[in-house]
């Protein structure tokens, strides 16, 4: 019995000893290693000119990681310095630079002479003071870095990159109003393009952001599927009617948009960043205008030869559609470019290529003016045209019941309805995908919603794959492709489901 009681007492003493090894009321990330600092007889330490009393010191045999797990290390004394003076939490040793999330050797004498050692610190009363990182603050450089292999940094001189560093050590990121603790960020000296060296905050990608690798995989598969779809439509003559040609132009625009997006993901377009941003913008906007062309031509096809649109279109309609789609995309790109050059208010500029992001800036609501706004208007237009076309089909079907050549008209109508249904599915997929993209942007500041829309983002990057499944891997297209490979001609009777609206108009007498 005595052995049991003795063992239990020893266990309690061990727990008590371990609990006393931590400084009461002091977070590990508010401490510094003071093992090498002078110690006085009363148990206090003098660290970097700061006297740390004995009750704010303790012996630790671990270090705390960013995820609050403990890593065993040699026993050492730590002091709660950040309760006595504001601290600044470095990623690396205090005189090293950081590049691509990695620490490099100490700065040279020339670099030390030209680097900016000051940071703005916001005090508890809201006032902002300029502080020297070494002389006025306690440097913490032995804490574990945030738990991610790749970190982003903020350049406060760029719009959308502003931040506030508080005296309690937390950092407020302005663009999404998120306050980061010292577990979630660190600062380090960084070389910038203007040859300056400044202290910049570094932090992990948002938890809702996607793996660059998986994002690339989704986009590259989409690009391959788009190429395959274009190839099939160019190879099979029957598919190269008016709708097929418009569809090919849509796919070409979409391909270029995704191509510049994947270049931006891997920073391959950094050498021509602004140009790549505008080319990507032009391509995506052009894809939307081509989608509007498809919805308009479908509506016109079911409206008969008496359609008012026919009076304004020349004989070569495909040329007119090219002038419209590419021309409108070019016009919006030109407006965006001019606004980027002449608008003085940073919050109203498109800011293409800002912050090494070779795309239009999406950090605030300005993107609604230049990108998502026009996109939304075209989506509304497409919805209108598809609804009008659906009503027209129902009217034609009803009138065709009393038509003298009922069988012929019904067959033609069924074929055209299949074409309409096919492109309607395309619009639903594309319209839904980009609508979710807009909603995702509007809710991006909310972490919970941002995570929920991760699936929508992957769906958006996989549009080319969905199109390939929808338009190529369908029985009618595969049948036409098989006959074309065998050397057969794409006669009208080859398939009952192929796109049939090239030269076909529903007889106006039906209406």
UniProtKB/Swiss-Prot annotation:
Phosphoserine sites (modified residues): 495, 500
Transmembrane segments: 216-236, 246-266, 274-294, 318-338, 367-387, 423-443, 453-473
A GO molecular-function annotation: G protein-coupled receptor activity
UniProt GO cellular component terms: membrane; plasma membrane
Extracellular face of the membrane: 22-215, 267-273, 339-366, 444-452
Mode of membrane association: Multi-pass membrane protein
Annotated glycan sites: 42, 120, 168
Disulfide bonds: 26-80, 82-87, 91-186, 92-103, 148-204
Signal peptide: 1-21
InterPro entries: GPCR_2-like_7TM (IPR017981), GPCR_2_secretin-like (IPR000832), Methusela_ecto_dom_1 (IPR044860), Methusela_ecto_dom_2 (IPR023311), Methuselah_N_dom (IPR010596), Methuselah_N_sf (IPR036272), Mth_GPCR (IPR051384)
Keyword RNA-binding: no
Pfam families (UniProt xref): 7tm_2, Methuselah_N
Similarity section: Belongs to the G-protein coupled receptor 2 family. Mth subfamily.
Protein name: Probable G-protein coupled receptor Mth-like 3
Originating organism: Drosophila melanogaster (Fruit fly)
């Amino acid at each position: 019995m005595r052995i049991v009681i003795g063992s239990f007492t020893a266990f309690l003493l061990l727990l008590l000893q371990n609990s006393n090894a931590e400084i009461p009321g002091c977070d590990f990330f508010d401490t510094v290693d003071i093992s090498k600092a002078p110690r006085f007889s009363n148990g206090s330490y003098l660290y970097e000119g700061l006297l740390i009393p004995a009750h704010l010191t303790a012996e630790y045999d671990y270090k705390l990681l960013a995820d609050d797990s403990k890593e065993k290390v040699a026993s050492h004394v730590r002091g709660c310095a950040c309760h006595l003076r504001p601290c600044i939490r470095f990623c690396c040793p205090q005189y090293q630079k950081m590049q691509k999330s990695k620490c490099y050797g100490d700065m040279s004498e020339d670099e030390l002479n030209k680097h900016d050692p000051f940071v703005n610190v916001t005090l508890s009363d809201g006032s902002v003071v300029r502080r020297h990182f070494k002389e006025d603050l306690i440097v913490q450089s032995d804490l574990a870095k945030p738990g991610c292999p790749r970190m982003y940094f903020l350049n406060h001189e760029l719009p959308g990159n502003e931040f506030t560093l508080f005296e309690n050590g937390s950092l407020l990121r302005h663009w999404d109003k998120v306050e980061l603790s010292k577990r979630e960020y660190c600062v380090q000296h960084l070389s910038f393009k203007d040859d300056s060296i400044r202290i910049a905050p570094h932090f992990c990608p948002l938890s809702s952001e996607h793996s660059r690798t998986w994002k690339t995989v989704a986009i590259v598969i989409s690009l391959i599927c788009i190429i395959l779809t274009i190839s099939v439509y160019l190879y099979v003559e029957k598919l190269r009617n008016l709708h097929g040609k418009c569809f090919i132009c849509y796919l070409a625009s979409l391909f270029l948009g995704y191509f510049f997006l994947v270049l931006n993901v891997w920073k391959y377009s950094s050498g021509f960043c602004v140009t790549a941003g505008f080319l990507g913008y032009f391509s995506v906007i052009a894809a939307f205008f081509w989608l509007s062309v498809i919805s308009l031509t479908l509506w016109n096809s079911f409206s008969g030869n008496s359609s008012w649109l026919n009076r304004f279109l020349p004989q070569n309609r495909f040329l007119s559609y090219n002038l419209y789609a590419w021309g409108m995309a070019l016009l919006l790109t030109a407006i965006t470019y001019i606004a980027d050059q002449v608008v003085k208010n940073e919050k109203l500029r498109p800011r293409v290529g800002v912050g090494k992001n070779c795309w239009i800036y999406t950090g605030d609501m300005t993107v609604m003016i230049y990108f998502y706004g026009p996109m939304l208007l075209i989506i509304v237009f497409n919805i209108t045209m598809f609804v009008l076309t659906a009503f027209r089909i129902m009217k034609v079907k009803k009138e065709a019941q009393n038509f003298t050549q009922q069988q012929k008209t019904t067959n033609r109508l069924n074929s055209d309805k299949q074409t309409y249904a096919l492109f309607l599915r395309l619009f639903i997929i594309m319209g839904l995908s980009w609508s979710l993209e807009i909603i995702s942007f509007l809710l991006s500041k909310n972490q919970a919603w941002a995570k929920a829309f991760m699936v929508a983002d992957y769906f958006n990057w996989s549009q080319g794959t969905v199109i390939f499944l929808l338009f190529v891997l369908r029985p009618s297209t595969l049948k036409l492709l098989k006959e074309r490979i065998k050397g057969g001609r794409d006669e009208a009777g080859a398939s009952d489901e192929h796109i049939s609206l090239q030269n076909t108009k529903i007889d106006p007498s039906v209406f």
